[in-house]
């Protein structure tokens, strides 16, 4: 009886391993299909492509300080940040907030639905790890900065920092001053919520926070 039980346990474990490998391969195919190709053309979307090295270093630094300070040290998922957020929620009564890395955000924005389910978060984490195994950090940052949603004007959406710069400031992203860079980074949290036309005070408060971080924190890049 023990031998039969042991045999079945081994079979079940092998089946689980096979299912996991198959699922990981499927996710890998989705990631490769999305990120090994050029940007697709989307109707009613303004998107200007820049290479990573064309973006101002101050802008990249602000982005990393606000969205993912451990970007160059993790492998797609920041487990330390997840534990820190959970600890703060459970023991310090802090608001439960997201702990998604830039890689996870890129996966979510490019491939996944907005559903806040456990299964989607698991998919997001696995695909972020696959993304980082497949591409270097500069590519991931470049892709994120070229595709992230920053504004809406009627039926037209503006994706990427370069198009956001043209929309909000009517200038090339390389010509932005620090406050304008901080404004674009601030808008990542919610272009509607921080809309400069409707909520200037709300936006200003967040911009000041980002400028303070940029001035006082150790540079990441």
Enumerate the predicted regions with their spans.
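Juxtamembrane regions of bacterial inner-membrane/periplasmic proteins
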Residues: 1-221
């Amino acid at each position: 009886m023990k031998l039969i039980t042991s045999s079945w346990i081994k079979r079940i474990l092998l089946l689980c391993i096979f299912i996991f490998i198959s699922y990981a391969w499927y996710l890998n195919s989705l990631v490769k299909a999305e990120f090994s190709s050029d940007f697709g053309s989307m109707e009613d979307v303004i998107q200007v492509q820049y290479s990573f090295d064309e973006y101002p270093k101050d802008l990249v630094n602000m982005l990393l300080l606000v969205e993912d300070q451990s970007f160059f040290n993790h492998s797609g998922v920041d487990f330390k940040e997840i534990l820190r957020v959970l600890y703060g929620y459970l023991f310090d009564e802090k608001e439960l907030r997201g702990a998604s890395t830039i890689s996870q955000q890129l996966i979510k924005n490019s491939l996944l639905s907005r559903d806040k389910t456990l299964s989607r978060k698991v998919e997001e984490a696995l695909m972020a790890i696959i993304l980082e195994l497949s591409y270097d950090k500069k590519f991931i940052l470049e892709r994120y900065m070229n595709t992230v949603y920053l504004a809406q004007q009627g039926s037209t959406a503006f994706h990427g920092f370069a198009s956001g710069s043209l929309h909000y400031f009517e200038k090339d992203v390389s010509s932005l001053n620090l406050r304008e860079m901080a404004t674009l980074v601030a808008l990542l949290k919610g272009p509607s919520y921080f809309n400069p036309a409707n909520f200037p005070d709300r936006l200003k408060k967040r911009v000041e926070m980002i400028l303070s971080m940029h001035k006082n924190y150790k540079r990441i890049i």
